[in-house]
UniProtKB/Swiss-Prot annotation:
Keywords carried by this UniProt record: Chromosome, Chromosome partition, Meiosis, Nucleus
Protein species of origin: Mus musculus (Mouse)
Its job: Meiosis-specific component of some cohesin complex required during the initial steps of prophase I in male meiosis. Probably required during early meiosis in males for separation of sister chromatids and homologous chromosomes. Replaces RAD21 in premeiotic S phase (during early stages of prophase I), while RAD21 reappears in later stages of prophase I. Involved in synaptonemal complex assembly, synapsis initiation and crossover recombination between homologous chromosomes during prophase I. Not required for meiosis in females in young mice, while it is required later as mice age.
Keyword Nucleus: yes
Expression sites by tissue: Specifically expressed in male and female gonads (at protein level).
Biological classification of the source: Eukaryota, Metazoa, Chordata, Craniata, Vertebrata
Stated name of the protein: Double-strand-break repair protein rad21-like protein 1
Primary localization class, coarse: nucleus
Similarity section: Belongs to the rad21 family.
Compartments, as annotated in UniProt: Nucleus; Chromosome
Length: 552
């Protein structure tokens, strides 16, 4: 009943009315202004399709809401226009009193205030200094006009045939007879006379006389130079001269001038300070610049990827097996990773020590001095007792029945006898119970085991050199440890102990020492020197005396 094309279509005539009735927030200002209420009401009154009474009521609600919106917009526009007019025409402030219809000049004129800008004084600015820095001298930017010595003979005859000197009637006999007469007396008057001879052809511009004066001005200070230049100047005589003309023999040197000699063209400056020397131009650089770089066509030898290469790349899984070594996300984790290695864990401090001296002190003070001193004294005492004697222990790997008793080395016997003797003296004074005996035995056993371990480490290189075999060295080391443990157990048995606890024997020992003691007990069990028993798994192991306890 409510769904019709007239109402629901966006372009329908009643769509905006239906939207205003049911969804007023969706209605925009443009929709309100575009809606014509008169036409809309006519369509509601006489619709093309029959509309239900309830639908028409909804449409009337939409018409009322749109009309309300239009009234609000009109009221807002009128209020805004009224406010603007009220602000524009203010009678209390603008209207003048009846007594004075003319406003004062100051009230209607803005004051002309010229502020003093912070500018430099023009008189104090020195313009010559920056201009002088960027200004070049005329001699540096002007090409020099070099006047050669040929100007005297070629300037006036520019464009004429070079037949002036070839005319037979040009030179007088006196001139030809004396070749030095052309240059000996050079003055302004002589140049004027020669000018009248050589520059007889005028060009009609009226400057025929200016050429000589210009040359006189240029050459007025260089008369000596001109004399030397003209002495070296070759004067070509006409080939048609008669052979009857004679030349004075005294002036033969002046006449014999080589033809290959070139004129020394040098321009002298009036002020020597103005001259400067140009650097020579390298011809190779100019040639390299002019060379054009040849373009070569580069073509890839492989223009396409083969199917085998593509299959090989797809089947390759090596990139998935690579170990990704990514940097830590933070700087602190990076420092921890760098200093957390084994090489730096026990040699550097946890905090950053910038000073190198502090780092050296930390490494020196890492081990206690008491531990170092005790280790050194122990080594010295062992070296004195052992000396240079070689240690030779019989093998334990043979049958137990074939050995009545295995002999110990004399040096090890001395060490064990001294330690056990001191131990017996302490035990005989305070023997009351088995617990007291075990409490006093454990420190002696620990000291003995540590001493034996250090002795074995000290004598290891000597044994290696004497035996020459690694297997023999290991066997001798285990033989020493085996007999040391067996002698200690024998001493305990003589004091009245029938059973030995592995837990008490391994007290204050690290894992390596405890494993060595346990392995020694297993070897003694194999040779039937002791018997091992354990009540429950992971319980303490008890060792008792075996049949071969005193026969090994």
């Amino acid at each position: 009943m409510f769904y019709t094309h007239v109402l629901m279509s966006k372009r329908g005539p009643l769509a905006k009315i239906w939207l205003a009735a049911h969804w007023e927030k969706k209605l925009t200002k443009a929709h309100v202004f575009e809606c014509n209420l008169e036409i809309t009401i006519q369509k509601i009154i006489s619709p093309k399709v029959k509309i239900a009474l309830r639908t028409s009521g909804h449409l009337l609600l939409g018409v009322v809401r749109i009309y309300n919106r239009k009234a609000k917009y009109l009221l807002a526009d009128c209020s805004e226009a009224f406010l603007k007019m009220k602000m524009t025409f203010r009678p209390g402030l603008v209207d003048l009193p009846k007594e004075n219809f003319e406003a004062a000049y100051n009230t209607i004129t803005l004051p002309e205030e010229f502020h003093d800008f912070e500018i430099y004084n023009i008189n104090e600015i020195d313009i010559s200094e920056p201009l002088a820095q960027n200004q070049s001298r005329p001699e540096e930017i002007t090409l020099r006009e070099e006047y050669s010595n040929d100007l005297l003979f070629q300037a006036g005859s520019f464009g004429d045939e070079p037949e002036i000197l070839r005319r037979h009637s040009f030179f007088d006999d006196n001139i030809l007879m004396n070749s030095s007469g052309l240059v000996v007396e050079h003055s302004s008057g002589s140049f004027a006379e020669e000018k009248s001879l050589f520059f007889d052809n005028g060009d009609g511009f009226g400057d025929e006389g200016a050429a000589g004066e210009m040359i006189d001005n240029l050459l007025q200070d260089e008369s000596t130079f001109l004399e030397e230049a003209y002495l070296n100047k070759e004067v070509s005589l006409p080939p048609e001269l008669p052979s009857s003309i004679m030349v004075e023999p005294g002036n033969s040197d002046d006449q014999c001038i080589p033809e290959d000699e070139e004129i020394n063209e040098i321009t002298l400056l009036s002020n020597e300070d103005e001259g400067f020397t140009l650097d020579p131009i390298d011809d190779l650089d100019i040639a390299d610049r002019r060379r054009r770089k040849k373009r070569r066509l580069l073509v890839d030898p492989v223009k396409e990827i083969s199917s085998k290469a593509m299959h090989r790349q797809l089947a390759s899984f090596m990139d998935t097996l690579m170990v990704l070594d990514l940097a830590p996300p933070t700087q602190r984790l990076m420092m921890w990773k760098k200093r957390g290695g084994v090489d730096m864990l026990l040699s550097t401090a946890t905090q950053d020590l910038i000073n190198d001296e502090l780092k050296m002190l930390f490494t020196k003070c890492f081990l206690s001095s008491d531990y170092k001193l005790a280790k050194l004294t122990l080594k010295e005492s062992v070296r004195k007792e052992v000396g240079n004697q070689q240690i030779a222990e019989p093998s334990v790997m043979g049958e137990p029945n074939s050995h009545s008793e295995l002999d110990q080395p004399q040096d090890w016997k001395d060490v064990t006898d001294e330690s056990v003797g001191s131990f017996q003296e302490n035990v005989n004074m305070n023997v009351n119970s088995e617990q007291d005996i075990l409490g006093m035995i454990s420190p002696a056993v620990e000291g003995l085991s540590s001493m034996n371990g250090s002795l074995a480490q000290e004598n290891c290189p000597a044994e290696l050199e004497s035996s020459g075999s690694k297997q023999n060295t290991e066997a001798e080391k285990w033989n020493q440890r085996l007999f040391q443990t067996l002698n200690v157990l024998r001493e305990f048995n003589k004091m009245g102990m029938q059973s030995f606890s592995l837990k008490k024997l391994c007290r204050n020992s690290d894992r390596k020492q405890a494993a060595a003691k346990f392995y020694t007990l297993l070897i003694l069990k194999k040779h039937r020197a002791i018997e091992l028993s354990q009540s429950v798994p992971y319980a303490d192991i008890i060792a008792t005396v075996g049949p071969m306890f005193y026969k090994m």
